[in-house]
Amino acid sequence: MNETAWLDRVFSNTSLGHRLLDRLTLTNLRHAFYLISPYETTVESIDDVPNYNAEVSAWWLVFLTAEFFILFISGHEDRFALNDSITSICAGMLSQCFKFGGRAVAIFLYVIVWDNWRILELPWDSPWTWIFCLFFQDFMYYLGHRAVHEAGFFWGLHTIHHSSEYYNFSTALRQAAIQDAGLAIYDCIQAFFIPPSIFLVHRYFSEIFQFIMHTSLVDTMGPLGLVFNTPSHHRVHHGRNPYCIDKNYGGVFIIWDKMFNTFEAERHDDPPIYGLVTNENTFNQIYLQFHALWDILIFKGFTKDVKGEPMFPGVVNKLKATVFPPGWFPGVPVTPFFHWMSMVNPAHGVPEPEKPVLRYSPPARILVKVYVASSFLLLLAIFFHFEYDRNHLSYLDCTVKIAYFVVTMQCFGAFFDMKWYARYIEIARCCGVLIYYGVLMFDHIGAGTHRLFVISLHIMAIALWTTDVLVEKLSQCCSKNQSINPEKGDLERAPEIASISKNVQ
């Protein structure tokens, strides 16, 4: 008897269920905590390095679900929100879309440097090379992470990760789509002596390890926190309290922060309040991804004070505004660090968070919440298929699917921001999907069951929002007609109503 027959019934016409369950292994669980050895992860070629992000993704779903359940039953439902979590996970999907084969763009630059300019060729099969890379790459991560906070427009490559006003596992996935471009220099420094395959292994696991740092469920971890990064240390990093600003950059190890005086312990009498010093107040994915970079490069240098005077007078100050720390203004002391300038006092000008904390969360109808949550699950399923199959897809297929992801995420943001046009762009999106699947009907697969299922869902979505719009318009017309044509009884009482209104005024 087929042991997975029940799975075939539950996940008919798709292999997604099998793919996820196949990855729920103890080995992948161990990988999620960076519990690996040189002997199981050392390979000669980068082509032999698995996509470890995809391997542990099933466990990430388990962690996310378990955390939400624990927070809910323990009375801490204020530590997560549907709109925030969906926005965060969508950001993670978008960041993966801009990586080739799941590997960071930096690996291609890395190989070029290694092939042409390496100074020393450490043996790829030596455990000592593996161990050296573990520490050296984490130090490079510290430098890169610090740079995207302090080195001017580099902050625009990282802002979205700190834009969440919550701190949970979904926040870990709130990644910038183009951050790898800013971190490439710190990756490529390793290419002068570390073999590409060893670099890539630790690159994967360094990123994977960051996921488990993003939770409020784990308190301090005692002696482990003296050497390793912990959720407590990283909570400080995400805080917008003055004492939290520009602290705790470490990835796996916290020792770099202690060496360079950027370490700060979590204060239980002043717990971190999460988000940005000035929060974004939107769930628009594209805006969250790119606006800070645009603002720093284009607008910051032309900022004026309340009197209308330029805050960055002269060309030099305007240029400094793009490369000096985000909180810098003329007269604020800075000091050089590596290739950028660092604030002498990172908390300069940072206000204390408001009390009580006010989070941006426009009240959405139950219909909107249920619809977006359901659409998100469909998007997530399509994305997992995309991640597993992307190496076999044509450039056209990849482009179309990425466009689908982006437009769908924008629709989610419009619904969560309660934009008047949300329903209209959702109807247009669904029509676009129907046109796409209509074209696919003419290929060799034809009208497959899974295609008909997706088409049916989008037809129902169009009907739902078209009906919703028509009902609203009809209601508005009725209200308008009622105000223009009042009932006879109201006309008879008009003098009395006018008299009351006059007295009130």
From Swiss-Prot:
GO terms for biological process: lipid biosynthetic process; membrane lipid metabolic process. A motif (Histidine box-3) lies at residues 234-238. It comes from the Eukaryota. It catalyses: 1-O-(1,2-saturated-alkyl)-sn-glycerol + (6R)-L-erythro-5,6,7,8-tetrahydrobiopterin + O2 = a 1-(1-hydroxyalkyl)-sn-glycerol + (6R)-L-erythro-6,7-dihydrobiopterin + H2O. A motif (Histidine box-1) lies at residues 145-149. Residues 130-262 form the Fatty acid hydroxylase domain. The chain crosses the membrane at residues 56-76, 104-124, 366-386, 396-416, 430-450, 452-472. Keywords: Endoplasmic reticulum, Iron, Membrane, Oxidoreductase, Transmembrane, Transmembrane helix. It is found in: Endoplasmic reticulum membrane. Its cofactor is Fe cation. Belongs to the sterol desaturase family. TMEM195 subfamily. This is Alkylglycerol monooxygenase. The lineage of its organism: Eukaryota, Metazoa, Ecdysozoa, Nematoda, Chromadorea. The gene is agmo-1.
